[in-house]
Every structure is written in structure tokens, then in C-alpha cells.
Amino acid sequence: MPARACALLTLGLGLLSALATFPAAAEDPIRITQLKRCGDLFAEDSLSWCLSAKALPRGEVQLYLNGERVAADELQRDGEQLRLTLAADAVRSGPLWLERDGLRSNPVWLSAGRSQVLAAKPDEVARNMDDLTTYVDLVSLIIEEDHKGLEKARQLAEKYGAKVVGAIPPLNTYQLRLPVKDLTERDAMVLRLGSEVGVDAVVIEESAAENDEQETGKTADQKRPQNREWAANRFLDAVDYYRERIPAGQRAGEKQPVRIGIIERAVDFDAPHFAEYLEPCDPQQQRTCLYARDADRPDNHGSSVAGILAAHASDARDQGFLSALDGTGPGFEVIVERNSDAGITANVAASVNLVEDGARILNWSWGIHRIGTVDVEGEPVDSLLRSGIAMSGYEELLEEFFLWLRREHPDVLVINSAGNGSAHSGRDDYRLPSSFITEQLLVVGGHERNDQEKVAVEHPDYVRKRKSSNVDMRVDITAAACTRAATLDPDKRGDVHCGTSYATPLVAGAVGAMLSVNPGLEPDQVRELLRRSAMTIGRDSDFEPAEADDLTAPILPSERGYRLDDRDVGRSARLDMRKALELTVESLKNSR
């Protein structure tokens, strides 16, 4: 063989050998992006769910529910979609995931609850007179409680040529698809439906999903360290106290994991903060477990809200509060669930399912303003607006939800963001849901670090009111409003996001830890402990009507040992996560 040919052969073999040492390109990870009820929602003998996933392999894939593999004959496949059908009496709510060759997808929560509503497609919406996007042919009927809801809804559907397509059965609420082509026809039919005997209200859905309760635009907050903001609520002090100071028998023992529902769309499991949840997770092993659909970006709203509770970060200062308690408490389950993109109606449907699945806490980082709402300066609020007719329907739906909650689940606490319109949070004509007066709704405002004052963390001037935060007597407590978004690069810190959306999960996390210590706490007792333990914010004592610098209901003498001369009396309340845990431990000795 000529020398040149021999050299080329040797070079070729060397290249092949080198290439063989490199692993084959890894397959894209499987990510579940959607899971919802489908088929006949009212079937009695079987229930079906439709699952959509990215990078679903062409070969066989295994589906697991509650840790057990689902039989192949219960699955149907169509491209990147799977349909799961189970006998009604065999369904148990729990985590669901896909596996292929030992690799797992993100776990999502499958609810056995029967509440499910449909979202409108792009060609099923229109602009109304207020220039707001509204559903054309999908509305929901709230049936009066002395009627059988489904039977009445079907009667009305037959009468009007409509079809029942969704439901929130515990609230006697049913979604109809109307035989209309435009808003004029819809409004005429809505008026007729609203006057029918047995119909309490008609809910019109406006715009898309509402969970972006955050400020818009980038500001100087990008330089604001997250840990400094959380220090204002003694975040790390609370973690240390829980792990080191609370006896093991008081934070674990025979107690069950605490289940928390977050009404959000999705979480990006490609972000390092959430990658650990792609591995098997058992809350009974004193772990925090996270279940959610997968998002496309790590800086989405759901990832930021869920991360405050459940992020796993190499820097302890960026660790989620509940995940920082791993190995010490009874375990926590954080369920990110949205039902569908059918706006406020879907928020309520998801909340009902989560409560029926055992959630003790609901995190509602969302809210809406009525058109015409003005802020504390008298300027119009221009975000998250809804028309008067839509607000009326939402108010009725939320009222039914809280009545049901008080009647059937009095131990559940809803924690809601006050809003970012710099408006009054408690005016029921202009703001929902924070304006509701019920012991089972805790409203959270936002504060930020006051860099102009060099004072101790306990001092009222350590923080100041976040300018955009909604205010007034209906706000129960405040917490840090700014957090850093997750990123795909573990060595890179994300942008700062601010809003009462991110103050809310700080309170939800504190309440979750409190309930893990004393599961017997009732919602009014939780509120009492949070306000008794609170640090303060704001000016001197002022019991006058809320003004621009009044953030929460003023601290009362009864919340300070009935001392009229206590310096905290009359000031606004600021979350103290450590002190709240201390008082919770004391509550075990002083059961009411």
C-alpha cells in the first residue's frame, strides 16, 4: 500500500476512534406541558385526561400515577399527546409523570376533582366596547343552591340550543357554549339566561389567564439583592429557628405533609432551581415536593412564585423557604395548578380541586381591578382591568367559593396579593378578590428595603411601602415585594421581579411552616399569630382612614398584650417569619 494511502487510512481510523469515544447526542428531556380533563366530563363510570408533552419519544413510554405504573391498555397515544382513561372508582389524586429508559419527566398533579372549565380559542374571543378581550360563546351559570345544578343547566342548555361543556360542581356552577356568533347575540342571551328561575348569576369571562400580578418594566430594582429584601422578614432567621430550635417531635413526629396549592400556569424544570424535582420525591421522607406543568422560560411568573417556596439553589440566600426546611419537618407538597386558561373561572375551578385534594393553603398571586378604579392619588389604574358586568359575575362566583369553603373546608386559608395599582384593596366595587371580608382570606401587601435609613431590622424605617402596592384596612400584613427570577445558567442570577405576587408566597411559606408545627391552627388563629408577631412599617400611630402611606390595618392594642402605650400600636404590620414560628410553638401549650 502506498505510504500516502496508508497515512490517510490511519488518520481515518483515528478519527473514527475519536468520534466513538464521544457519547451520542442526548435526547431532549420529556416535559409535560398540559394535563386536563377531556372527553365526557360528566361520565359516571370513567374519567379521562389528555396530556401533552414535549420530546415525547416515538417508542414505548411509561406513565406513573402515585408511584404506580399505569397499564398500557388505559393509555391512547396521538403524536405528542396521551389520553388516560381510568375507572371512576379507581382514581386517586396524586403526582403523575412519564418515564423512558430511566429518565423522568416533570411531575404534574392529577386531580380526581370534577371541576373543569374550557378556555376560548383565539377565534372565539372578541373586543368589547371597553376594548377588552372577552369570550363570545362561553359563559358560566351559577345555579341557585336549591336546584340540582347539572339538571338545571342541561334544561337551560336545551331550551337555548346551548351545550354544557364545563363545570364546578361544588359551587353549582356550569359552563355553557352558547349558539351565538357575536357579542350582540351573546349579551342578549346572557340577559335572558340571567332572568331564568334558578339562575343566581351569569359569569362572563374577559381576557386570558390572570396571574401576572406583578409590576411591569425594569427599574433600579435590578441592583436590589434578594437576600436583603427577605432579611426584612427574617427569612433565614426563620429557617435556622425551624431547623435548630424547634424540637423534632413538634415539627415532624406523626404529622402529615402540608399541601399547598399555587394558582399558576407552569414552572420551568430546565432551570437548575427546579432540576432536583425531576428525581423521585416523597414528602413522607421530610422532603418538599413540587408538581407543575413545564414552562418555556425560567423567568415566567409561575417559576418566580413557586421558587420562593421550593427553589433549590447553591446559594442558601436564594433557597426557597420550604425546601430549606428539608430533612426537618413533616414534608411539604407544592402543587402548581391552573385548570385551564379560562381566566378567573379557571382559577376558582383549580382552587376547588386543590381544596378537595387536601390543600390547607392556597396561594392566589392574582387579582383584578374594575374599569374606573383610581389609585390613592386619584389617577386611573390601567392594569388588570375588567368591565362592570364581568366584575359582577366574578364577585358572585368568588362569594360562592368562600361560602363553600366556610361550610365544607373551614380549615383552609387563601393567601392573596393585595395588587399593584397603588389603589385601595378593600373596595369591593373596584378590586377582587382581596376585598372579600372573610376569616379564610389573608391579604398581603408589599414593601421594599429603605436604603436611606441605617437602622436595625426591627425598626419601622428598615423598610418602606412599595409605591405600587395596594393599601388600606383590608390588607392584613406586608412582605418583601422583590425576588430574583430563575435562570438556565446556575452561575448567573436572574432579573429582579417586584410586586405583591412575590410577597404572597413568603407569607404562604411562613403559614405552611406554622401549620407543620401546629396543624390544628384555624385561619383566624393564623392571622392573629402573624399580626401578633409582626414587625412594623410606616409612620407613627394613626387610626385615621387609610391614606397614601397607610399600608395595612393598624396593629391593635389587643395584638400587643392590650397595651395602649406599645410603640407598635397604630402602625402597619410587617411579616416576621421567625417570631411567627416562635408564637406557633407557644400555641401548642395554649390551645384555644
Question: For the regions a protein language model found, what residue spans apply to each?
Answer:
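C-terminal subdomain of the subtilisin-like protease fold in secreted/lumenal serine endopeptidases
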Residues: 12-15, 361-363, 440-441, 518-592
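Beta-strand/beta-sandwich contexts
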Residues: 26-62, 103-131
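Protease zymogen maturation seam
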Residues: 117-132, 191-259, 267, 271-273, ...
